[in-house]
């Protein structure tokens, strides 16, 4: 029962803090600052809320494999199973353009704030043209010096589940030569999708070796990324502390 109370308190604080940071972002957009300079705001948002999750809910984290992050712009493919990685993406990798469904940028205050960072907002109902949108906009972001964050499963998956990875991130890599960095974690076991409860424990984030798309097809890049991510998640979960007791 106590963990439920803590989870409710954290959720209320999450909404309040997110609204506050949304206003700060909108005000910062009025200043002559680049996206990279303003990125300190969402980074601070992610760091603060993950710290708050540790304090209020007892949900901490570790990050492994940071030496695998390339020095040039890259595409990170993330396992998607929780809200938590939406916070963590802000500080685990360098400033990057977020790939998301366009409905997000319509949300008052928060969505408007997201829009000021020029995300890759995709109309998912557009089918194949949505992939083209992603590749075209992703190419522009990479050329500007920013990385690209992609959740190839397209939606949050329940613990232990996955689906065929979407091709857009891998296609972007093959067309631009940008390396793909797979990122695995077990956040969904502690902070499940569609659940208010945040369980105490430690989330492990593991950054995998970059995948060089040279000479590979988008399907091959995708397969390598998915195999590594899903195998690493299974490995994390199988170890002591990998999931709640």
Report each predicted region and the residues it spans.
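Transmembrane alpha-helices and immediately adjacent membrane-cytoplasm interface residues
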Residues: 51-61
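Non-catalytic C-terminal accessory region of glycerolipid acyltransferases
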Residues: 4, 131-245
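Membrane-interfacial terminal anchoring regions of lipid-handling membrane enzymes
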Residues: 1-31, 40, 67, 220-245
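Generic preference for hydrophobic
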Residues: 63, 76, 98-99, 205-207
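Short acidic-hydrophobic, aromatic-tinged amphipathic segments that line or gate anion-handling sites
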Residues: 63, 120-123, 213
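Catalytic core of membrane glycerolipid acyltransferases/transacylases, capturing the structured
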Residues: 25-47, 55-56, 70-127
């Amino acid at each position: 029962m106590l963990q439920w109370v803590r989870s409710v308190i954290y959720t209320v604080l999450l909404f309040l803090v997110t609204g506050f940071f949304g206003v700060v972002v909108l005000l910062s957009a009025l200043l002559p600052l680049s996206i990279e300079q303003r990125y300190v705001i969402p980074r601070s948002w992610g760091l603060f809320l993950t710290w708050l999750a540790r304090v209020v809910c007892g949900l901490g984290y570790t990050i492994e494999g940071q030496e695998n992050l390339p020095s040039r712009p890259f595409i990170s493919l993330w396992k998607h199973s929780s809200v938590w990685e939406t916070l963590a993406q802000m500080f685990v990798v360098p400033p990057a353009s977020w790939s998301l469904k366009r409905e997000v940028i319509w949300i008052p205050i928060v969505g408007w704030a997201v829009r000021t960072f020029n995300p890759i907002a995709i109309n998912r109902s557009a089918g194949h043209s949505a992939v083209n949108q992603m590749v075209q906009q992703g190419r522009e972001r990479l050329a500007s010096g920013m990385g690209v964050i992609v959740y190839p499963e397209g939606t949050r998956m329940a613990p232990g589940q996955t689906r065929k990875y979407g091709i857009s991130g891998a296609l972007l890599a093959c067309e631009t030569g940008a390396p793909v960095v797979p990122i695995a974690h077990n956040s969904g076991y502690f902070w499940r999708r569609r659940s208010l409860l945040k369980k105490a424990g430690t989330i492990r984030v593991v950054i995998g070796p970059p995948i060089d798309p040279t000479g590979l097809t988008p399907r091959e890049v995708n397969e390598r990324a998915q195999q590594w991510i899903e195998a690493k998640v299974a490995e994390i979960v199988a170890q002591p502390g990998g999931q709640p007791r």
